[in-house]
Structure formats: C-alpha cells, structure tokens
A protein has these predicted regions:
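Generic beta-sheet signal
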Residues: 2, 147-155
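Loop-to-helix element that buttresses phosphate recognition and phosphoryl-transfer chemistry
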Residues: 3, 8-61, 125-136
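Active-site metal-binding loops of divalent metal-dependent hydrolases
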Residues: 8, 157, 203-205
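Phosphate-coordination/substrate-recognition cap region in phosphate-metabolizing enzymes
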Residues: 32-110
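Glycine-rich phosphate-binding loop signature in dinucleotide/nucleotide-binding domains
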Residues: 38-40, 143-148
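Acidic, low-complexity terminal tails and accessory targeting/binding regions
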Residues: 77-101, 130, 145-150, 165-220
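Internal catalytic-core helix/loop-beta-alpha segment
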Residues: 110-146
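GST superfamily/GST-like fold recognition
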Residues: 157-161, 193
Length: 220
C-alpha cells in the first residue's frame, strides 16, 4: 500500500509558512503512532524537500518509532501559492487574519490554479503545469517499479491531489477542488501493482478520530 500524507499544520499567515506549528507536529506524531499501532511498517519513504515535509516526517517517525530514511523527491514539492496569486491579483495581499480574508485568499488561489493548469499563465519561478504533473508521476512510477510493500510519501495538497487526479483521470477543476479539501496530516491510500495505482481512500484522518482531537483537524 502507498500512503500519501499531507504535511501537518504549517504557519499560514506568518512570515514563513514553511514551518510546522506546534499543532502540526502533534498531528504528525499522532499519525505515526496510529501507523505503528496498526502494524504498518514502511519499506520505503519519499518526501518533498520543503522544511514542512522534513518536519512532518520527523514527527511521524517520532510517533512511529521505526521509519526508514527518506528519499528526497523535488517533484513532491508544493506549488508557490504566492506566485500563483500574483498572476491574478496585483499588489500586496492582506494578512489572512479573519475568515473573510481567508476565504478571499482561497478564491484567488482557485482562480490562479485554473489559469496555470490551463497554460494561460506562467507564475514566476514555477514549473509549468505539465512539468509539475510529471514530477508527481515520476514519484508514483518510482514506487510502482521498485517496491511491493508499504511505502510512505510525505508531501503537500497540490501533489497529492495531482496524484489522485492522475489515478482517477479527473478534470483540472476537480483536481483543484480535491486539493483545497485535503486536511493537514491526512492520509490518502493507493493500492499498487507494477502497472497501476488504485485509489483506496482519500483525505482520511483516523489518528484524529476522537472527540478530544476534533479541534486538531485543520486545512492550512
């Protein structure tokens, strides 16, 4: 089984988003403990190269107790949301410190993603959509061709939604909606053979499935 995990809660709205919050670390520690308690031992681990990916994996490993060293895979890195939004919005963005501004941020992101995926825009410093999807496909191909046991991928919402879209053949609009629904530390499962991946579950948070952890469920 391939387990694709979105990073824990990062520092949305802060000067440096690419850093787990204290809650994000707890989310990932709880996930690692859940994996261990269910007898899941990973044959291999891949992760993106962003700080939040490394910190999330470290917390998962702390909770699990026995996780192999990871292969760093740049194709699992997230898109640059600020560069995307600059293609549809001129000038500085207000700090997302209220529900209204938060919603406005994601409306702009949805619009910007659609333009990028359709090839209408070329956000500064970012790959094309086709190159982005190729990076994700390369990680999936690597898993299929080299492994037979349980594999862990730690990445972000964009690459995970893209992977699901590739497996299911979804439209760009559907891929965007999948992306914006993925929760922090959520697990998406693919069964796989040397020839294909099959979606088993999406956006699952079994490690947070308790009343006392309801407030631990986050999206950014």
């Amino acid at each position: 089984m391939l387990y694709l995990v979105r990073h824990g809660q990062a520092s949305f709205g802060a000067a440096d988003y690419d850093r787990l919050s204290a809650l994000g670390a707890r989310q990932c520690q709880a996930l690692g403990h859940w994996f261990a308690s269910h007898g899941i031992a990973f044959e291999a681990v891949l992760r993106g190269t962003l700080r939040r990916h490394a910190q999330s994996l470290a917390a998962i490993a702390e909770g699990h107790g026995n996780v192999p060293a990871a292969l760093e895979w740049p194709g699992l890195n997230e898109y640059d949301s600020e560069a995307l939004i600059r293609t549809v919005h001129e000038g500085p963005l207000p700090k997302p410190d209220s529900p209204e501004v938060y919603r406005a941020h994601f409306r702009l992101l949805r619009e910007a993603l659609a333009g990028w995926m359709a090839g209408r825009t070329a956000p500064a410093g970012m790959p094309s959509w086709s190159d982005f999807t190729a990076g994700v496909a390369g990680a999936l191909d690597h898993v299929r061709s080299r492994h037979r046991g349980d594999v862990l991928i730690v990445s972000s919402g964009g690459p995970i939604a893209t992977a699901v879209g590739q497996v299911l053949g979804t439209s760009p609009d559907t891929t965007i909606e999948l992306n914006l629904r993925i929760r922090n530390s959520a697990v998406t499962e693919f069964a796989f053979t040397p020839k294909r991946h099959v979606l088993v579950s999406f956006n699952h948070v079994p490690h947070l499935d308790a009343a006392e952890r309801r407030a631990w469920i986050t999206h950014a």
